[in-house]
UniProtKB/Swiss-Prot annotation:
InterPro entries: Ribosomal_bL28, Ribosomal_bL28/bL31-like_sf, Ribosomal_bL28_bact-type, Ribosomal_bL28_sf. This is Large ribosomal subunit protein bL28. GO terms for biological process: translation. One of its GO terms (cellular component) is cytosolic large ribosomal subunit. It comes from the Bacteria. It holds the Pfam family Ribosomal_L28. Belongs to the bacterial ribosomal protein bL28 family. The lineage of its organism: Bacteria, Pseudomonadati, Pseudomonadota, Betaproteobacteria, Burkholderiales. GO terms for molecular function: structural constituent of ribosome.
Amino acid sequence: MARVCEVTGKKPMVGNNVSHANNKTKRRFLPNLQYRRFWVESENRWVRLRVSSAALRLIDKNGIDSVLADMRARGQA
């Protein structure tokens, strides 16, 4: 699926553009996705993930091994 974070599952949301005159038109809020390579020391290889900026902070906090273990438990990696 396009534009989905592989770690957090964040997807585009739907909302409104609101003008100064309070006119509303539909728009999409896209997650801030980046392709990023992570070195996995336990597997001695690089892993390439499409992650949101929130997922990058999660990986910094918990470590890539912990995040990959959670993804594998969900059946995503």
